[in-house]
Amino acid sequence: MENKKPLVLISNDDGYHANGIKTLVNFLKDWCDLLVVAPESARSGFACAFSATTPLRLKRRHNMGNDVEVWSCSGTPVDCVKLALDQFLADRKPDLIIGGINHGDNSSVNNHYSGTMGVAKEGCMQHIPSIAFSSCNYDENADLTPLRDGVLKVVKMVLEKGLPEYTCLNVNFPALPPFKGFKGCRMTHGSWINEVDHRTHPHGYDYYWMVGEYRNDEPEATDTDQWAVNHGYIAITPTRIDVTDYDWLKNFEL
């Protein structure tokens, strides 16, 4: 019998227990077949890293929403996607892969650091339409239910229309509703400064925290993801796996 519901693989970088991933499952569980494979603990900032030198563990967890199967993985978000496709979904390819909902902004250059985006990029490289959802609200207990309508609209659009090959979506919600609507926009040119907090332990050795402040390098631009979320819009940034600078290539001589 043909499967009537779309199959969606869900992962994140905040861990299988995170509020954001549970909220996403609640949004989708009534009309999608879902599988959750997510890190056993927070893996923020792991981007597209995978475990090349250590073995991985999978552990079955309590179901979400009564019948949504949940597994935790000892590795990175990308490991979760790779293992899920190989161990659980070899006979039925997902219609969609989703990373999120992330607790924190993944616009601008955060796109490159984000494990949530790592999920979407890995899905994209596996030729599966993929989306990353993030909220600019960093509170791990934040009420994310206001994101429901926006998430469902994007998911349904991608399931119906698909995405270009090697393109995934980076979707960022403002910290607080109401949301003014959607903006298709480009990635903001930004950077991190003052990133290292150097401290001295009471036992005498030095140690360091990676902290930092985000700097918008084009604050006047109005076509960027940062502008959109700062002005109450849901930012949708199509992200290509191919990062070649074709303009530079046109003029290359050596």
Specify the residue positions occupied by each region the protein language model found.
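Glycine-rich phosphate/pyrophosphate-binding loops
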Residues: 124-146
